[in-house]
Amino acid sequence: GSGTSFQAIVASGTRSALPHGVASEKLIENGDLLTIDMGAIWDGYCSDMTRTVNVGKAAPKAREIYDLVYRAQVAASDAIDPEFEADKIARDIISEAGFGAFFGHGLGHGVGMDIHEAPRVSYLGKGKLAAGQIVTCEPGVYLEGFGGVRIEDMLHITQNGAQILTQTPKPATLLEI
C-alpha cells in the first residue's frame, strides 16, 4: 500500500509543546516554533520523521532547547546498537541541562507495517534491540506555555550500531524560516 503512516502533526507556538498535538484554528505566527511530524507508507511499510523549525527570529530559549535536543538526538543515534540502552544517553543529556522533567516520552519505537511496533526504545522498554530492527530516535523537550522541540529520524539497527535512514536534512542549529 501507499499513503500516509498517520495524520501529520503540525503544531506551532505553545501548541508545539503537545507531543501529539493535532491541527487547530491557531494561526502560525512570526516567532513560533513549528514542529512537523509526518510519515508515508511505501510498499506496505511505514515511515516516521519529525523536524522543528522557527518561523522568523527564534527566541534564545527556543535556540537553547533546539541545541539540547539536537545534541541528545545525535548522541543517541551515534551510540545506539543491539546492546545499548539508547534512551539513557538522550535522557541524561536532557536531564543534566535541567530539562529532564520536560522529556515526557520514550526515545523511540519500532516501525514496520504499523507505525508503532515493538520494540519500545524507552526506559520502560523490555529487552534489547536486535540487528535488523527499524526504530525511531526522537528525543524532545516540551515547555508548556512556550513550545517544544522534537527531532526524529528512523534508524536501521546493525550488529555494530545503526544506519540513519531519514534523508531529510537535520540542521545543527535552529532553522529560521
Question: What is each of the regions a protein language model found here?
Answer:
Residues 1-177:
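Active-site neighborhoods and metal-handling regions in enzymes and metal-associated proteins
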